[in-house]
A protein has these predicted regions:
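Flexible, glycine/small-residue-enriched loop-and-beta-strand segment within the central core
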Residues: 71-200, 227-228, 235-236
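Generic hydrophobic alpha-helical segments
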Residues: 194, 212-214, 231
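C-terminal/domain-terminus segments
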Residues: 200-225
């Protein structure tokens, strides 16, 4: 089933290993295009959900679809360990969302939880991630991590406040907007950093451990740190 590109029809849960395949639960359609999916698992509780995998091993990745018209695109050479993509929840489906993983990325331990419609997550090529917890609770929000970046242990990314904030005078929601978190090319995000609202980290920058980033920064080649984060030093770069 997983040796070549093809359409796999009518399953909600599929687990594959080198020696055997297990198919369970009710029957739904899903388009599953990949060459290397040993030890991968997919739960599909919707329709027209797609996975396009270009020669990356999905061992260590779980994908859960709760909703319709969602897609996962994984470029060549990316690997996963104990990582999960959640499109919605069992009683809270989401539609028209996308997760894109570029070439030669490494995602070790963590989850990306998309909790509302029309959200996008893009992780560009040669990015490494350790124990990421990303949640998209608001419609049309997005997370973009540019190429050659590194996220240390315990990073949290939430493009929203988590709950609606209401103005008591007119009962209108004051934080109802499209949040976009952006991490620039070749950035190093330290351990236990939190990025919220529409946080933006410029190219070639570092964010110090335990920092809270809640706004857009625009000076490249800089160090940002603190709660909330602020510019600490500029005219720097870093290497592994």
């Amino acid at each position: 089933m997983c040796s070549r590109t093809r359409k796999v029809k009518y399953f909600m849960f599929i687990t594959t290993t080198e020696k055997h395949k297990i198919l369970d639960f009710k029957l739904f359609k899903v388009k599953f295009k990949n060459k290397h999916c040993k030890n991968s698992s997919v739960k599909n509780y919707g329709k027209n959900n797609t996975i396009k995998n270009k020669e990356s091993y999905l061992s260590g990745l779980q994908i859960h679809f709760y909703g319709n018209n969602n897609k996962v695109i994984i470029e060549k050479g990316s690997t996963f360990s104990n990582f999960t993509f959640n499109f919605g929840l069992f009683n809270h489906p989401v539609n028209n969302c996308e997760i894109f993983i570029g070439k030669n990325c490494y995602l070790n331990w963590g989850n990306i939880d998309i909790l509302t419609d029309n959200c996008v997550v893009k992780i560009k090529e040669n990015t490494s991630i350790q124990n990421l917890h990303a949640r998209l609770p608001h419609k049309k929000s997005s997370i973009t991590i540019e190429k050659n970046s590194m996220l240390s242990w315990g990073v949290q990314i939430i493009p929203h406040d988590g709950h609606d904030i209401i103005n008591l005078n007119d009962e209108k929601t004051i934080n109802d907007c499209e949040y976009q978190i952006k991490i620039g090319e070749h950035c190093w995000i330290g351990s236990d950093v939190k990025l919220i609202h529409s946080a933006t980290i410029p190219k070639n920058s570092i964010v110090g451990a335990n920092s809270l980033v809640n706004k857009e920064f625009n000076i490249e080649n800089a160090i940002y740190a603190g709660v909330p984060a602020k510019l600490i030093r500029n005219n720097i770069t870093w290497k592994e």
